[in-house]
UniProtKB/Swiss-Prot annotation:
Belongs to the bacterial ribosomal protein bL12 family. Forms part of the ribosomal stalk which helps the ribosome interact with GTP-bound translation factors. Is thus essential for accurate translation. Pfam families: Ribosomal_L12 (PF00542), Ribosomal_L12_N (PF16320). This is Large ribosomal subunit protein bL12. It comes from Methylorubrum populi (strain ATCC BAA-705 / NCIMB 13946 / BJ001). Signal peptide: none annotated. Keywords: Ribonucleoprotein, Ribosomal protein. The lineage of its organism: Bacteria, Pseudomonadati, Pseudomonadota, Alphaproteobacteria, Hyphomicrobiales. One of its GO terms (cellular component) is cytosolic large ribosomal subunit.
Amino acid sequence: MADLAKIVEDLSSLTVLEAAELAKLLEEKWGVSAAAAVAVAAGPAGGGAAAPAAEEQTEFTVVLASAGDKKIEVIKEVRAITGLGLKEAKDLVEGAPKPVKESVAKDEAEKLKAQLEKAGAKVELK
């Protein structure tokens, strides 16, 4: 147990950048993806909530279907919405269809959809 306590203490002292680098190294070492684990963990919770809300959906996922002709404008808008860095936003836009924002209220989802469409993107709400 002393070894585990030492590991916890060491991990707690990492900066955000160091923690991100550690995550990348562990993903490579173990051949896994942290994004896949988050999607799997979020899947059952979303599925259980969707059944009772069959009458009217209250939470939406804003999905970028395609960037359209104005990719740079769409990347700028994705950065503004998500707070992602330039490379991450570019990867998201180029990897479309991808979710831009998940579990948002209907009003916010409609607003985000309008922003992205104004920039030239094709957007879906799910």
